[in-house]
Curated annotation (Swiss-Prot):
Disordered: region residues: 120-184, 1649-1672
Carrier domain mapped to chain residues: 184-262
Annotated residues for binding of Mg(2+): D1725, V1726, E1727, T1824, H1825
Name of this protein: Fatty acid synthase alpha subunit pigJ
Organism for this UniProt entry: Monascus ruber
Keyword vocabulary terms for this entry: Magnesium, Metal-binding, Multifunctional enzyme, NADP, Oxidoreductase, Phosphopantetheine, Phosphoprotein, Pigment, Transferase
Modified residue annotations for O-(pantetheine 4'-phosphoryl)serine: S222
Domain spans labelled Ketosynthase family 3 (KS3): 1058-1585
GO molecular function: 3-oxoacyl-[acyl-carrier-protein] reductase (NADPH) activity; 3-oxoacyl-[acyl-carrier-protein] synthase activity; fatty acid synthase activity; holo-[acyl-carrier-protein] synthase activity; magnesium ion binding; pigment binding
Annotated pathway: Secondary metabolite biosynthesis
Disulfide bonds: none
Residues involved in acetyl-CoA binding: 1725-1727, 1761, 1770-1780, 1823-1825
Gene that encodes it: pigJ
GO cellular component, one term: fatty acid synthase complex
């Protein structure tokens, strides 16, 4: 009927059809019908829409649609219509799924029902029953599918309800030979759809719910939907309309009709990519198919299903071998079988007995004969080939024999070496000297400045007492290194008045002594009191050692006391000997006197070593040599000190030694040196006398104190003993010979080097000390060699016999015996401390002793008499035995006492015994907090700051309310801890462990018990707060901060194998490889005739062979020397923050950084829901100014590199690479703001440019809130290009210099070599202060000033510039401008505000109508007055440069807050560690300070944050800003831990000091930060402490603000901790702030007053209560009529303000009295609080009711309360507009009562009568206290009189 209706011409045919029964007749009718339809189509307009709708209504009747034509045009249209009708449920989808759409061009066989020949048994009836349980993936591809054997089907238990596969049929087939039954399921459209969509979503095929649509799976991302549907269109051709809204199952059914049963173009490409990228060489698609067939019994068609699904679970990296690939396929088959609900068994697990039957036995002799014959043939073939190629194999044999002989000889030598020496000796002589690793220190001048500031910081009230400064030797050390800039610093300290007694005199004395010190050489002075050893047995039986003062505390007096020699002569403990005629060394009194004089000078005036050059070996920690070096540095010497440890580990010890001890002119070079190595001895001396000598090419003194401890007997001497002997004897002599040789060659005869030869009193008496005595005895031969050798003109010998020295590393094991030694045999021997022995040796290095040594060798006996102990070993053994015995007795007594107590009390200790309390384990819990800044009280502010109340327009003052960062050291808090503490706090360890995924929070049952707390992420065991440091410190330090690049964090990028592409030309044809047809065609297109392509037999794959002459790119890897970076802590995961997985997969990593930072920044501002902002501001008033230097580098890498390499890349990657995309994601997922998105790109100065843009937006009023900051990532491309510019530090070069990764960023140092890249993000939430106060948000700091600047003409983009000098631009007139005076500006502002209020009075008088003041008039007057006042505040407070541009912008911004350029105490420097930047930056800052007149001696403390964090580029300025705010809040200035030696070029900049350690600076007022970016981006910002803003607030306003902030902190801390525990710090918004409705959006965007939920303080806006409206009117009138109160600190005539205000209001009322009575009247009164006579009881009783008096007396300030009520009574009386009965009339009839804190008016007596007579029904009153005055306004409302 449908055809008859649409095509009337067919009516005869159609009408005749029902009557027909003959098949032939039906065919004839069908033929006629077809002809008529074709004729109609050709002759008349086609009505295909109606035709389709009509035909598709009868799916039960019409099941086959056949298009006659060359293409599937109409059929495609019909399929789309059918799919659309199914999705809209017009017709049942199950009915439409049975339809067939065929075309004569493609489906001839099906149209004519031509079936292929079938084999096997027919399908049994039971098979149909199992069809319903089979999965949909097994659906037949078409009606032509061959019938095969039935498979056993099981339902997988692992299938979830959401993803459980639907049913399908599985025909049966014969059982394979292996014994397993494998169903034959051909590839269907469903398989392909599932595989392609799962691959696109990066999920496994069994994780995709097929009941969902593409639209649902993509989460509404239109680009992703478009990409998927585009790929499906390439694969299948035409798709159903609205295919993205069709469930995947139905979509597969809809596409099945024309599916050819094999992968199409897109799927083939994905399979090819899987094979080429992940499979091992040679394991192609055919190999995969063969394995599936042989191992699992898959047919070719069924195997295609598994191969297609493989693209969804591809391995992370290329599989190494074919076995690995087969294992991968086996795992995939198991997973597929579970998903499809089928059971599969590998054939190898079936019946294998047949395999054994096929084994063949071969006779062994026959096999050996075959092998022998084959070998003979191969040898003959080799000989023929050698002859043909003219190769002499015999000659090769001779060479081989020679090599073997040489090898044997070497082995024999090694055997002899090993038999004579051992591995300890061999490794012990290894050379370690490397001139590149020498550390040189000469920046004593900077440490002098730092010491001066530290010393002065302790000379303030409440700091350390004066005597403590003297005891620590701080003053003496400072005077040693005094320089002119130190005098400036002290003088400034005295001039500013910060110094108070008793420190005032001390500072002045230091200044005087410093002036004297400049005229003298620095000296070493020995001031240590003499101590003696004491060993006691404690009450617990432990042997305890200590040192106590000697009776004779004078060390010099002790030495002179001496011993009585055998001759009866008293010999000092330290004395000199000379050789007697009998060749024996005798005490020499004359020379000893010279030594004692030197010692006396050293303990008095001091010894100077200025200009002397010294080499000291063996100066490790706790050594005599180290103490000697300290003394030499104190005396101003130039020292070379050697270390056998790695320089990186030893440098910190020596650097601290230099920083603490170096005097003026002192230098120190630390040299790696192995004294047991001959090569090192030679290299060291060559270095000393070479071109780069740190001691000017010669030595004055040589102190070879290097030693190796030994503890072996003669019977056990080994290689270590020989090594020690070599170091302590042989190589000392070698060094002397090398020095002599160098001096002789240079003719340095007149300057002999004095050698302090280390001798000992131990010449074998100790025993068990190896060859140590022999080494020392051998050195004594030098005394004789001096005369027999030829070097006496170049070297002088002074032998120093060292006595018993306490506390050295070598004597640690015997330090307990010191007291026994001193009393041994009654000899009265003395032992020495390290400092005492070092003093003795330093006395030997004085000019007088040196002159004595030039006359001949000198023997210095420094043994203290220990040499006289003959039986020292016995003495030591007896002492040990005594200690052991006494200790044992004491322990036995202790045990006995414990036993007694146990018997008596049942415990080991008596109940009242508290002498030895048991240690208690720490149970302190960490407290995670966002660390809100403290808000001081008004009284605290008044004590330290000027009062700025009313002086600043807070609506145009920019403050930071929240900030956050993500970098190498985690967040801002953990970075700050590392920066100023060099360690993490307990809270810091917890946060870092959480960030790195080491722990997680657990709440539930653990080991069967309820548990809430932290657990280890791997072991799931509980971790107590106190255990975090112990468990995780090593891991955190190894995987955070600056470190070697971890390839796992960068997608496999390994700098040691940096990849490049090398173009090559093929010289010989390459072996063929298989690939898809599409790839084969692509190779032919690229290589042309240089490639041969042919199809593989019985396969869809093609063989490709690259021919000779083809050229293409081959990857290669080269080592890259930038292998250190500041990556995010290993283990950081955005999912842990709560970012959805689909977002993580979609966006670039920098976007994830920003999202994490924004969420935490909001919490640090106390904002849990960002939409809360829109309760206070319009959605268009939030600006997003996040910027970046390089943008989404990972996305760019995928866009260019991976796309070029044909890797899988998301289709919308281009949008992710845009520089503004990150800011867009932040807005889409967090803010939903319609404010501007501004994306600054300022290279390394991006964050400051962003801050500048945000501040401009807020100050201009275009925005009230701004999100600012910057971000950048670390990627290999940028890293390489930075290296090409020589901007970054070479990690290879740094390692060669002995630098560890954490040391490679060294801003401002002599050895800096470029910056170290890092990655991260920094974000701040800024807003105007007025809004921040209203919302109760924490104010971290004030952004007082920001500026960006370009630079000069040039050709270099990276060149540092000086454009930001313009921030200090100022003329001489501006320097002394009166506008810089706060008092002057306050007076001018007060005048303008008074004028505004006079104008308000006039306007109110002019606009008052019969019914009072219209609301609109009040609105206009109020707005205008407020605008005028704010304009005045801005002109006289915020921006004084608008009146006088000659004032410097920096000065003007500081003057706003009552500060000067001298109040800036810290500068956070860009400090990149490049040569050019660090010197340029210091120069710019110094010029600015000089030009602005900063006081000399008031240096800025430089903070170089990049020493810790590296250089994050875009985030650099943000991290600096965070550091500045943290300094202002804590009063701590962090040091630059890597500043081991400040560049001497920076010494000229006296306005800057570079501290190495953190320095306390309480009450920091302001900080400055500078930033410089490539491309002429110079930035500067000034940050002021928030307390200066609080000083501009009224006391009640500040207190209310404090309460709001405290509440926010509690809520924010709770939300932060909860977010960490639940992994939900980030919460993506699903709905815009206005909801889902477009109409709601339009209303909000078009209404400037639209707010979310109404303003929190105006929630009753819809309340029509008249009382509420009247209250509002009174408050507004009060604000309009009251001028701003003057600060209490400003002097003004008494009563002037009150009189002026009263007069103005009286004038207004007088002008109104002539008008007729109206419905509203107003009364205003201002009273001085002090005018209320509180002592006059009569006055109080006459004018105040009893309840009023009770209320006032109960208030904290009764007088102010009485004054408020008195003023209100006066205002009410005036509002009644009745004649006064006199000034003495009582006012008790007007009663002011308090109703919940709101004043209410009650009238009595005559006052009430007057009110009733005038028709007054209601009187409202408002009372305002301010300073010393109180003001009241009353509004009386009455009915109009007729």
């Amino acid at each position: 009927m449908a055809v008859r209706k649409l095509v009337p011409e067919t009516a005869p045919v159609v009408d005749d059809a029902p009557a027909s029964t003959s098949v032939d007749h039906k065919r004839s009718l069908a033929h006629k019908l077809l002809i008529e339809l074709l004729s109609y189509q050709l002759a008349l307009p086609v009505r295909w829409i109606e035709t389709q709708n009509e035909l598709l209504q009868w799916p039960e009747t019409i099941q086959r649609y056949v298009e006659v034509g060359p293409r599937t045009t109409l059929v495609t249209m019909a399929k789309k219509t059918a799919a659309r009708r199914a999705s809209s449920q017009i017709v049942s989808a199950s009915k439409l799924s049975t339809l067939k759409f065929l075309c004569t061009s493609d489906n001839t066989a099906e149209i004519y029902y031509e079936y292929p020949q079938e084999s096997g048994a027919p399908v049994e009836e039971e098979g149909s029953k199992s069809d319903a349980a089979a999965p949909a993936l097994a659906v037949s591809g078409s009606s032509r599918t061959a019938t095969t054997a039935k498979a056993t089907v099981t339902t997988p238990s692992s299938s979830s309800p959401e993803t459980a596969p639907p049913a399908a049929s599985t025909p049966s087939q014969g059982t394979p030979a292996g014994g397993s039954t494998t169903p034959d399921i051909p590839l269907s459209a469903k398989h392909v759809v599932l595989a392609m969509i799962a691959q696109k979503f990066r999920r496994a095929f069994d994780n995709i719910p097929t009941q969902k649509t593409v639209q649902e799976l993509s989460g509404g991302k239109s680009t992703l939907q478009n990409e998927i549907m585009g790929d499906l269109a390439v694969e299948f051709g035409q798709l159903p309309d609205g295919g993205e809204y069709i469930p995947l199952d139905a979509l597969g059914d809809a596409l099945q009709g024309n599916f050819p049963g094999k992968p199409g173009k897109q799927m083939s490409s994905l399979i090819t990519k899987l094979i080429s990228r992940k499979m091992p060489g040679g394991f192609n698609q055919a190999a995969m198919q063969n394995h599936l067939e042989r191992e699992w019994g898959f047919s070719k068609a069924h195997g295609q299903v598994v191969i297609c699904l493989a693209i969804t679970v591809e391995p992370e990296s290329r599989l190494e071998s074919a076995d690995s690939a087969r294992e991968f396929l086996d795992g995939l088959v198991s997973r597929y079988a579970s998903y499809a609900g089928i059971t599969m068994t590998p054939r190898g697990k079936g019946n294998v007995s047949a395999d054994h039957s096929s084994a063949v036995m071969v006779d062994e002799s026959v096999l050996n004969g075959i092998k022998r014959e084959q070998r003979d043939y191969q040898i003959k073939e080799l000989e023929l080939l050698s002859k043909h190629l003219q190769l002499d194999t015999a000659a090769d044999d001779a060479v081989l024999n020679e090599l073997r002989a040489s090898q044997k000889s070497l082995e024999e030598k090694l055997d002899r070496w090993a038999s004579e020496f051992d591995d300890k000796f061999f490794s012990g002589i290894e050379a370690i000297f490397d001139a590149r690793k020498v550390r040189q220190y000469d920046s004593w001048w900077n440490w002098a400045r730092e010491d001066t500031m530290r010393l002065l910081s302790r000379m303030r009230p409440g700091q350390l007492p004066l005597q403590h400064l003297q005891e620590q030797g701080l003053v003496a050390q400072l005077l040693r290194r005094w320089e002119p800039s130190c005098a400036e610093i002290v003088q400034n300290f005295l001039d500013t008045g910060e110094c108070k007694e008793p420190f005032l005199a001390t500072a002045a004395e230091i200044l005087r002594l410093g002036s004297d010190a400049l005229k003298k050489s620095p000296v070493y002075r020995f001031t240590t009191p003499s101590m003696k050893p004491r060993t006691v047995i404690s009450a617990t039986g432990c042997v305890e050692y200590s040192e106590v003062p000697r009776e004779n505390s004078s060390y010099i007096a002790l030495l002179k006391q001496g011993l009585v020699a055998a001759s009866g002569e008293r010999v000092p403990y330290v004395h000199l000997k000379k050789k007697a005629p009998d060749q024996a060394w005798r005490y020499d009194a004359q020379s000893t006197e010279i030594l004692l004089e030197a010692l006396g000078t050293g303990s008095g005036a001091g010894l100077t070593f200025s200009g002397k050059t010294v080499l000291v070996t063996g100066a490790g920690p706790n050594s005599i040599g180290a103490a000697v070096v300290r003394g030499l540095l104190n005396g101003g010497a130039k020292v070379i000190v050697t270390t056998s440890r790695s320089v990186s580990s030893a440098a910190s010890f020596f650097q601290r030694m230099y920083r603490e001890c170096a005097a003026r002119g002192a230098t120190m070079a630390v040299v790696p040196f192995n004294q047991a190595s001959k090569r090192d001895c030679e290299s060291l001396v060559e270095y000393i006398y070479g071109a780069h000598s740190p001691v000017d090419g010669d030595l004055d003194y040589l102190v070879p104190f290097g030693a190796i401890p030994e503890k072996v007997e003669l019977s056990k001497l080994d290689g270590a003993s020989e090594l020690a002997h070599r170091a302590m004897l042989v190589n000392i002599l070698r060094i002397l010979g090398l020095v002599y040789k160098e001096k002789e060659q240079r003719g340095l005869r007149t300057r002999p080097t004095t050698v302090i030869v280390p001798l000992s009193f131990n010449l074998g008496g100790f025993g068990g000390d190896g060859l140590y005595p022999e080494s020392k005895i051998g050195l004594e031969a030098l005394f004789n060699r001096y005369f027999s050798g030829n070097w006496s003109d170049y070297l002088s010998i002074c032998g120093a016999a060292i006595g018993w020295v306490r506390g050295t590393t070598l004597s640690q094991s015997i330090r307990l015996l010191g007291e026994a030694i001193e009393h041994a045999n009654g000899l009265d021997v003395i032992t020495f401390s390290q400092e005492e022995m070092a003093f003795n040796i330093l006395a030997l290095m004085t000019p007088s002793i040196a002159e004595t040594c030039e006359e001949g060798p000198v023997y210095a006996d420094l043994t203290g008499g220990a040499k006289a102990i003959a039986n020292i070993k016995d003495v030591m053994a007896a002492a040990r035995a005594k200690f052991l015995k006494e200790s044992s007795i004491q322990k036995a007594l202790l045990a006995e006492r414990a036993y007694e107590q146990r018997v008596l009390y049942g415990s080991e200790s008596p109940r009242n015994d508290t002498s030895s309390p048991r240690p208690r384990l720490s149970t302190k819990r960490a407290r995670l907090s966002l660390e809100f800044p403290e808000v001081p009280s008004k009284s605290d502010l008044k004590a330290h700051l000027v009062d700025l109340q009313g002086m600043v327009d807070l609506s145009r003052t920019v403050v930071v309310v929240g900030f956050s960062e993500l970098g190498p050291w985690g967040n801002a808090r953990t970075r700050w801890q590392m920066e100023h503490l060099t360690d993490l706090t307990p809270e810091g360890y917890i946060e870092m462990a959480w960030i790195m995924g080491l722990v997680e929070h657990f709440q539930g049952h653990l080991d069967g018990k309820p548990f809430v707390g932290w657990v280890d992420a791997q072991t799931k065991q509980p971790v107590a707060d106190a255990e975090f440091k112990e468990k995780y410190q090593a891991h955190i330090l190894a995987h955070a901060g600056l470190r070697f690049v971890e390839p796992d964090l960068l997608g496999g990028y390994d700098p040691s194998k940096k990849e490049f592409l090398q173009e090559i030309v093929v010289e010989e044809a390459l072996p063929s490889f298989s690939t898809s047809k599409a790839n084969a065609d692509a190779f032919r297109l690229r290589l042309g005739d240089k490639v041969a392509v042919r199809r593989m037999p019985e396969s869809d794959e093609y063989l490709v062979q690259v021919k000779r002459g083809a050229h293409f790119f081959v990857p290669k890897a080269v080592p890259f020397n930038r292998g250190v970076a500041g990556l995010l802590p290993a283990g950081w995961d955005p999912l842990r923050y709560g970012i959805p997985e689909d977002i993580v997969q979609q966006v670039d990593p920098v976007t994830l950084y920003a999202l994490c930072c924004v969420s935490e920044a909001l919490l640090s501002a106390g904002i849990r829901d960002p939409y809360e902002l829109y309760r206070y501001i319009h959605v268009s008033e939030l600006a997003n100014c996040l910027g970046t230097g390089a943008g989404a580098q990972s996305a760019a890498q995928r866009l260019y590199k991976k796309r070029y390499l044909d890797h899988a890349v998301q289709s919308d990657i281009l949008s992710e690479s845009f520089l503004n995309t990150t800011a867009a994601w932040v807005n889409m997922l967090v803010f939903s703001s319609t404010g501007p998105i501004k994306t600054p790109v300022g290279a390394c100065a991006t964050a400051i440019e962003s801050l500048d843009i945000g501040c401009d937006a807020i100050r201009s009023g275009r925005s009230q809130v701004a999100l600012v900051g910057g971000y950048d990532d670390f990627r290999e491309e940028a890293s390489y290009e930075f290296a090409m510019m020589n901007a970054t530090a070479s990690s290879v070069g740094e390692l060669a210099q002995g630098r560890l990764p954490r040391e490679m960023s060294r801003p401002s140092t002599t050895t800096r070599g470029g910056f170290v890249e890092s990655a991260g993000c920094g974000v701040q939430l800024i807003m105007n202060a007025e809004l921040a106060i209203e919302m109760g948000l924490p104010i971290h700091a004030i952004i007082a000033y920001t500026q960006m600047a370009g630079d000069k003409i040039g050709r270099s983009i990276p060149a540092p510039g000086q454009g930001i000098l313009t921030a200090a631009r100022e003329t001489s007139a501006g320097h002394d401008s009166a506008l810089l005076d706060l008092a002057h500006r306050r007076k001018r502002l007060t005048d303008e505000v008074d004028a505004v209020h006079q104008w308000v009075t006039q306007q109110l008088a002019a606009t008052r109508g019969p019914a009072g003041w219209p609301d609109r008039a009040i609105d206009e007057i109020e707005a205008t007055a407020l605008r005028k006042i704010k304009h005045a505040q801005h002109a006289w407070g915020n921006d004084i440069r608008c009146q006088d541009p000659s004032i410097s912008p920096l000065k003007a911004s500081l003057a706003t807050w009552g500060l000067t350029i001298d109040d800036v105490q810290v500068v956070s420097m860009h400090g990149t560690s490049t040569k050019a930047n660090d010197t340029n930056e210091a120069d710019v800052i110094s010029q600015q300070m000089d030009h602005l007149g900063r006081r000399p001696g008031n240096p800025l403390l430089a903070v170089c944050q990049k020493a810790l964090t590296g250089h994050p580029k875009g985030a650099a300025g943000a991290w600096q800003l965070h550091g500045c705010m943290q300094m202002l809040q804590t009063g701590i200035v962090p040091g630059n831990r890597n500043a081991d030696n400040i560049d001497s070029k920076l010494r000229q900049h006296r306005h800057i000091v570079y501290p190495m350690e953190s320095m306390p600076m309480p009450q920091l007022k302001a900080a400055m930060l500078t930033s410089f970016g490539f491309g002429q981006k110079g930035g500067i910002a000034v940050v002021v402490a928030a307390r200066h803003l609080f000083s501009a607030m009224a006391e009640d306003e500040l207190e209310a603000y404090r309460r709001r902030v405290a509440k926010r902190q509690r809520e924010a801390d709770s939300a932060y901790v909860s977010g960490i525990m639940s992994k939900s710090l980030f919460k993506a918004k699903e709905v815009s702030v206005w909801g889902k409705s477009d109409a709601s959006m339009s209303r909000m965007l078009l209404d400037p007053k639209a707010r979310v939920g109404g303003h929190p303080e105006n929630n009753n806006n819809n309340n029509n209560n008249s009382s509420s409206k009247r209250n509002t009117s009174i408050e507004r009138l009060t604000r309009l009529l009251l001028p701003s109160q003057k600060p209490e600190t400003e002097a003004s005539p008494e009563g002037q303000q009150s009189t002026s205000l009263t007069a103005s209001i009286q004038a207004l009322l007088a002008s109104q009295s002539t008008t007729r009575p109206t419905s509203t009247s107003i009364g205003v009164d201002v009273e001085a609080i002090s005018s209320i006579p509180m002592g006059n009881a009569v006055f109080l009783e006459r004018n105040f009711t009893r309840s009023e008096r009770d209320h006032c007396f109960s208030s904290p300030t009764p007088q102010a309360s009485f004054a408020g009520r008195w003023s209100a009574k006066e205002a009410v009386f005036k509002s009644l507009q009745t004649p006064s009965v006199g000034a003495g009339a009582a006012m008790a009839e007007i009663e002011i009562v308090s109703d919940g804190g709101v004043p209410k008016v009650q009238l009595h007596g005559r006052a009430k009568e007057v009110a009733l007579a005038k028709g007054i029904r209601n009187i409202q009153a408002s009372i305002t206290h301010s300073g010393e005055t109180v003001t009241a306004v009353a509004l009386a409302e009455s009915s109009p009189m007729c």
